[in-house]
């Protein structure tokens, strides 16, 4: 999964790496990645990355208070795992930064979050490339061919 890959990359830079998951990951812990309960994780880390399924809520107003200010939040999820008004309030505090790959999860390119100076949003899905687009189209055509050959 993406979170595990990110954690291992950060270890290569000799960073202290922590994670939270509903299920413990002994294989990650054996590599030196430390598990923390979510509340404790928020109070411990300076940078938090989220790697969740679409429409999975994670943080509310109280969680952002625990996370605090002077932090970086990175979201790789297609949707925001927190209410946008709560995210906006947190971003209005000094020293907070938000990095996200697509504008859909922050209300679009015409939304006020997209235009905030402490938000980095290239509005391109991180895994998107010309090659991935070609491969996707090939897969769609293969699926159509397979379906038509059996029906």
Predicted regions: what they are:
Residues 9, 18, 62-72, 146-147:
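P-loop/Walker A phosphate-binding loop and immediately adjacent motor/lid segment at beta-alpha junctions
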Residues 24-112:
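Rossmann-like adenosine-cofactor binding region
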Residues 11-30:
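NAD(P)-binding Rossmann-fold cofactor-contacting core
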Residues 7, 15-16, 96:
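Residues at the starts of beta-strands that form the adenosine-phosphate
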Residues 97, 105-151:
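C-terminal helix-to-coil terminal segments
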Residues 1-11:
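Glycine-rich adenosine-cofactor-binding loop
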Residues 18, 34-36, 120:
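General small-molecule cofactor/ligand-binding pocket signal
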């Amino acid at each position: 999964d993406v979170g595990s890959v990110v954690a291992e990359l950060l270890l290569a830079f000799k960073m202290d790496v922590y994670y939270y998951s509903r299920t413990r990951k002994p294989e990650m812990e054996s590599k030196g990645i430390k598990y923390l309960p979510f509340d404790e994780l928020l109070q411990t880390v300076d940078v938090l990355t989220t790697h969740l399924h679409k429409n999975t809520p994670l943080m509310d107003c109280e969680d952002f208070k625990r996370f605090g200010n002077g932090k970086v939040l990175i979201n790789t999820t297609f949707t925001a795992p927190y209410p946008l008004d709560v995210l906006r309030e947190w971003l209005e505090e000094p020293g907070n930064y938000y990095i996200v790959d697509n504008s859909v999860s922050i209300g679009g390119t015409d939304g006020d979050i997209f235009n905030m100076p402490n938000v980095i949003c290239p509005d391109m899905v991180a895994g998107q490339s010309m090659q991935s687009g070609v491969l996707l189209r090939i897969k769609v055509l293969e699926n159509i061919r397979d379906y038509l050959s059996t029906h």
